[in-house]
Regions:
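Membrane-embedded and interfacial regions of multi-pass energy-transducing membrane proteins
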Residues: 75, 226, 230-242, 256-275
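Hydrophobic alpha-helical membrane-insertion segments
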Residues: 162-170, 246-265
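Loop-to-transmembrane boundary segments
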Residues: 240-251, 345-351
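Hydrophobic transmembrane alpha-helices and their helix-loop junctions in integral membrane proteins
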Residues: 1-239
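Alpha-helical transmembrane spans of integral membrane proteins, capturing the lipid-embedded, hydrophobic core
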Residues: 41, 123, 251, 255, ...
């Protein structure tokens, strides 16, 4: 239990998720490195290393999977309402970490393979989005999406790169995020039919997928379209050539893995999954097309539902601002911390 608590705090799982959006002060390349591939993945890496030892226990399954599911839903929902580009990406990271945690919590070898695959895919599309956000901040002077409108006419090439990366984050077909997300959907369907979980897990997974599409659409539409810029500190323009190279490389990986997953990530995924499972690999397929399956239907429903959520976002913003938007986990944490210090001072004075 103590190890699992360490994992949850390190990888920003609910209710310890609130620190991650406030840890964005580093320069853009550092943020991209820390928040897509290294620091926040340390907790789920520990889950992966402990998977062969602990995954058979019922406590692991229920605690890890339910925490991952709560984090997946909360992060996806909250990301839609963040006005700061990095804030949106931070909460989307929380959601994807919840997805990975949920897969490890399910406890089957195939779920672990899907988790490892999504760790790799998330690192590529999220790093490219953080780099794109840094370019936008550098050239426009702000990350506020209420001001960043209509940048397509000023930065069309950057917009195309960001749109591909956001599509991968949303799980659009022929991009890498679609493949690992479909594997995730497939596992939820399997559990609903074979393990007696019934309908609620696939429903929750599809709902999270809808919000992922919605916040990805907001990243694209609010920044590059949606009217004209509003009082930008600088006149935006395309960045210097070498500033775009890291984003280009990562976006090419998103495309290449989405189209040719077995050729590009196949050997690396097999090696990483074998190291995680500490044994033989289960049968799995990295094909782009598996036919008309329930997982594909969930993916298409998530895309359609996400577009619908984004189309009716204004009433949702109003409801959010009057309800859950008022809750601040960081404020609760600081109050608890202050209470601990006051209690320690009282005990010290008595002694």
């Amino acid at each position: 239990m103590l190890i699992i608590l360490c994992v949850f705090t390190k990888s920003a799982q609910f209710p310890f998720h609130f620190w991650l959006p406030h840890a964005m002060a580093a320069p853009t390349p550092v943020s991209a490195y820390l928040h897509s591939a290294t620091m926040v993945k340390a907790g789920v890496f520990l889950l992966a290393r402990l998977f062969p030892v602990l995954s058979d226990s019922a406590e692991w399954t229920w605690i890890v999977s339910l925490t991952g599911l709560a984090t997946l839903l909360l992060g996806a929902y909250t990301a839609l309402f963040k006005h700061d580009l990095k804030g949106l990406l931070a909460y989307s990271t929380i959601s994807h970490l919840g997805l990975i945690t949920l897969l490890f919590g399910i406890g089957t070898p195939l779920a672990a393979v899907a988790a490892v695959f999504h760790i790799m895919n998330h690192a590529t599309f999220k790093a490219s989005l953080f780099m794109a956000a840094g370019i936008i901040d550098h050239e426009a002077g702000t990350r506020d999406m209420r001001k960043l409108n209509g940048l397509w006419k000023y930065m069309p090439y950057t917009a195309v790169l960001a749109m591909v990366a956001a599509g991968a984050m949303a799980g659009v077909p022929l991009l890498n995020g679609f493949l690992s997300k479909e594997m995730f959907f497939e596992k939820t369907v399997y559990l609903s039919t074979e393990a007696g979980v019934t309908w609620w897990l696939p429903t929750a997974a599809t709902l999270a997928g809808m919000f992922a599409v919605a916040y990805s659409l907001r990243f694209i539409h609010d920044v590059f379209f949606n009217g004209e810029p509003v009082n930008l500190p600088r006149t935006p323009h395309e960045p210097p050539r070498w500033m775009k190279v890291p984003v280009e490389i990562l976006v090419v990986i998103c495309l290449a893995v989405g189209v040719l997953p077995a050729v590009t990530f196949g050997p690396l995924l097999a090696a990483a999954a074998r190291a995680t499972l500490q044994g033989d690999l289960p049968q799995y397929s990295l094909a782009v097309w598996h036919g008309f399956t329930p997982a594909l239907a969930m993916s298409l429903l998530a895309i359609a539902g996400g577009a619908l959520i984004y189309a009716f976002r204004k009433p949702l913003f109003s409801v959010h601002d009057r309800s859950i938007g008022r809750v601040d986990g960081r404020r609760f944490y600081l109050r608890i911390e202050a209470l601990i210090y006051r209690t320690a001072d009282i005990i010290d004075s008595i002694l």
